[in-house]
Design a protein with these regions (language model features):
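Acidic/histidine-rich alpha-helical segments that form the ligand environment
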Residues: 83-128
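A short, mixed-charge helix-start or loop-turn motif at secondary-structure junctions
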Residues: 3-7, 93-98, 138-142
Length: 168
């Protein structure tokens, strides 16, 4: 699927990919939902995958809120940057090892809605014009929104499909 280029496409892809993800998950048996992926090195189950998505939603939500309120903050919290962010993902994984699957699902569903609500408040121009906001650096707000939602859901879909295929 092509990367969204406007607000309508972004909202549509984010919603469709999220719905596909949740349908795929909901069609697993209870045992399969709690099963271990035989192939991942970091995210080892559905809970880990959902917690990862939730944490990236939080990055987007907090970054947008702070910057739109005049508090200049980078997308990735210190001490992380785009060279070492895999270390941050490991910290997210560690943080959620005691999170229940049910909590991970609930958090993800809410944070998904929160992201959509944020996206809704912006125009196409505000979302997809590079450097429209100085706090987006050389890219656009929409690019960050795509990364936090639709493209990340695509990754999660591929991960859980791969897991489902391994069950056969």
């Amino acid at each position: 699927m092509a990367r969204p280029k406007n607000k309508e496409e972004l909202l549509q892809q984010a919603t469709e990919n999220f719905d596909k993800l949740m349908t795929l998950f909901n069609n697993l048996s209870d045992e399969e939902k709690r099963g271990t992926f035989p192939f991942e090195t970091r995210d080892k189950n559905c809970r880990d995958t959902f917690a990862h998505l939730y944490e990236w939603h939080q990055l987007f939500i907090n970054w947008e809120r702070d910057n739109s309120n005049g508090q200049a903050k980078p997308f990735l919290p210190a001490p992380y940057n785009w060279k070492n962010y895999p270390d941050m993902n490991i910290k997210f994984w560690e943080k959620h090892q005691t999170t229940s699957l049910e909590t991970a699902v609930t958090q993800l569903e809410k944070s998904h809605q929160d992201c959509l609500q944020i996206i809704e408040t912006y125009t196409d121009e505000e979302l997809f014009t590079k450097k429209y906001y100085n706090w987006t650096g050389s890219t656009s707000l929409g690019s960050y929104a795509v990364s936090a939602t639709s493209s990340h859901y695509d990754w999660a879909l591929k991960t859980i499909r791969k897991y489902k295929k391994s069950l056969k």
